[in-house]
Every structure is written in structure tokens, then in C-alpha cells.
Amino acid sequence: VIANSNSEKDQNLKYIVRDNLINYMNTLCNNCKSKEETIEVVSNHISNFTDIANQTIKDNGFSYTANVEIGNFEFPTKTYGDISFPAGYYDALKVNLGSSSGQNWWCVLYPSLCFVDVTSGIVPDESKETLKDNLTDEEYKLISDRNDSTINFKFKLIELFSHNHILTAKN
């Protein structure tokens, strides 16, 4: 969902539209068992998503409209707790509000990572299991492994002096 602008009112509306669309999607796609099935169901109901978004906009006193489309869109890296999705192109339902020049909110349609606890960013175990079932072991490892490697900063000049036993200061 891409807000009309970054004004507080437009950003708040974005979340109201989001919540209404998620509620509809939850009932519509609750029993979907694959990404392909989810895309098919959403595609078949695209006009309903548009109607819900437009009605929400109108009910909240705004005069612009929503444009809703399904496609393959570019997304930034997104991390939910211990799951990270790399930046790239993903199949998604894209909702543009008004001029769509504001900040966006995005989620993964399948499995339903839209429904995570936004405050803690925790991915439910059920969604993790669905990911495991739909990804190869290598793909799942890529998104779920935490990179806990430590970064060590070094100064080459200090290493050179230390290695060659060169004193830099005397008492």
C-alpha cells in the first residue's frame, strides 16, 4: 500500500486501508495452500480489493481513489524477526492511493506474513512452516539464517608498525 503522500493524514489512511484489505484477504485466502492459488484467488477478486480501498478512502473523507494491481514488483530488503527477505522482485498486490508519492507498507501475501505482530516483527511458527514447505532448504536457509559474524575494524598503519616493532612514542 503506497500512501498518497507522507502527510500524517495520508499515512494514517494508508494503515486503515491496509487493515481493511488484510481483513478481506484473511477471509478470502485463509485456506490457500500455495502461492499460485493465492495469486489466482486475489486476481479473481481484484475489483473487490479496489472497491474496499476506494470505500475506505471515501469513508475517511478523502477524494482521491485507489489503483489496485497484481504483478511482479521491486521490493527492498525486509526483515521480520529472524526472517529476512532480500531485495528483489516479488509477486504482489500493489495498492496505490491517490498520487502514491508517500511511504509504502508491504507484506508477503503467501505465506501470510502480512499478519505478523507489527510491533515485535515476530513471524508466527505456522508461517515459518509454510515457508519451509514452499522453499528449498537452501532458499529457506538464505532467508532464515542470521548473520552473526563480527566485523573487526583494523588500521593497516598500526598493524605495520606493530608487526615491525616500530615504536611510535617514547617516554
Provide a role label for each language-model segment.
Residues 1-2, 65-69, 92-96, 106-108, ...:
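Soluble periplasmic/extracytoplasmic beta-strand elements of cell-envelope proteins
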Residues 1-46:
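Early exported N-terminus immediately downstream of N-terminal targeting peptides
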Residues 6-7, 73-76, 102, 113-115:
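Solvent-exposed loop/turn segments at secondary-structure junctions
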Residues 28, 45, 56, 96, ...:
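Residues that form generic nucleotide/phosphate-binding pockets
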Residues 35-76:
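Amphipathic, coiled-coil-like alpha-helical scaffolding segments used for oligomerization/assembly
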Residues 79-80:
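Glycine-rich, charged/polar anion/phosphate-binding loops
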Residues 83-151:
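Soluble extracytoplasmic domains of inner/organellar membrane proteins
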Residues 142-171:
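Short flanking/linker segments adjacent to small metal-binding domains or redox-active Cys/His motifs
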